């Protein structure tokens, strides 16, 4: 058997795509290896969201190439889509470049590359979605207590800071029956929890027997799977929130009381410049609606600091929004211009030192709220889903709370792996909880 090594960067959709690539390639006689130096085929599944993603890729490619000259090297993912032929110019030893929508063609690309000994590329946006081109055997093969399931891909929003519409294409929703079959297979393989994925997951509008279902209706349907205990979804857009999703949170106990809802800024001026097509007030109304229906619900978000034209007043509006919402956790980044996006063309770029100073202030507030939320759990007993992830200390195992907090307990008898266990929280830290199994 030949060795296959896949390195995945970026979002959960990339993790899902890497599993699909592994499954579509295995019939060619490949087995996954953990050491790139022992691989005959290396795939770098890339992300293009953060600054200097391409430069990091070329640095990594040089290291990979130095390990073993006779290996086949594939660049996949969003950098592959954005860079295209430029990858071959910068790294001539790369054999294949393939975009996210073309991974079903990987077997033929690999065969073609081996025969021609030349460069092979496919960064098309095919009319037939990639989900329809891959065989059923590629889906639902993940092992473990928590699994990813892509239900929607692509983006029609065209936020002025973002490359996703250009690298992932237009929004596409998979049919309900196809998703349900994959969910059944994942649960049969041991998944207690399913994470529904999409670039705009709550824009889901899948077909089912002549009807169009939204995300709320899909969740209620998937919840009928008897042995499935938890459902999550990510990532949502405020513009696509709808009534059936609110009601699903209120009525479906398997749906976790935690929503990742990126807002990016608290300034209406900046939100308009970002082409978000919602206001800070509308975002806060969504938060309030959720909390009225499900008082125990919590939120995380994404923030971009230093978008072109952002003033100190605009930034203070973001700080005020964070104070109002009080997030369980949040992710914040300095704005980095992405080539080809409208934001990159603007002349009113914010100085780097200003972005850095604002980011530190925002992260200080976010960290304070996260610690306070974690501290509020001390003394409570919460259900925690454990996997095979080990902690820093001997016999320690790590699981996830309903709110995506890392929870550490002692498992010296190896009893809790891949199970949901009631845990009494004894101590709170900045990004984790410590507890003991409660019987």
UniProtKB/Swiss-Prot annotation:
It is an enzyme of class 2 (transferase). GO terms for cellular component: cytosol. SUPFAM superfamilies: Radical SAM enzymes. Residues 375-439 form the TRAM domain. Residues 141-372 form the Radical SAM core domain. Keywords: 4Fe-4S, Cytoplasm, Iron, Iron-sulfur, Metal-binding, S-adenosyl-L-methionine, Transferase, tRNA processing. It is found in: Cytoplasm. Monomer. Its EC number is 2.8.4.3. Gene3D superfamilies: Methylthiotransferase, N-terminal domain (3.40.50.12160), tm_1862 like domain (3.80.30.20). Its cofactor is [4Fe-4S] cluster. Belongs to the methylthiotransferase family. MiaB subfamily. GO terms for molecular function: 4 iron, 4 sulfur cluster binding; metal ion binding; N6-isopentenyladenosine methylthiotransferase activity. [4Fe-4S] cluster 2 binds at residues 155, 159, 162. It catalyses: N(6)-dimethylallyladenosine(37) in tRNA + (sulfur carrier)-SH + AH2 + 2 S-adenosyl-L-methionine = 2-methylsulfanyl-N(6)-dimethylallyladenosine(37) in tRNA + (sulfur carrier)-H + 5'-deoxyadenosine + L-methionine + A + S-adenosyl-L-homocysteine + 2 H(+). Catalyzes the methylthiolation of N6-(dimethylallyl)adenosine (i(6)A), leading to the formation of 2-methylthio-N6-(dimethylallyl)adenosine (ms(2)i(6)A) at position 37 in tRNAs that read codons beginning with uridine. It comes from Wolbachia pipientis wMel. PANTHER family: CDK5 REGULATORY SUBUNIT-ASSOCIATED PROTEIN 1, MITOCHONDRIAL TRNA METHYLTHIOTRANSFERASE CDK5RAP1. This is tRNA-2-methylthio-N(6)-dimethylallyladenosine synthase.
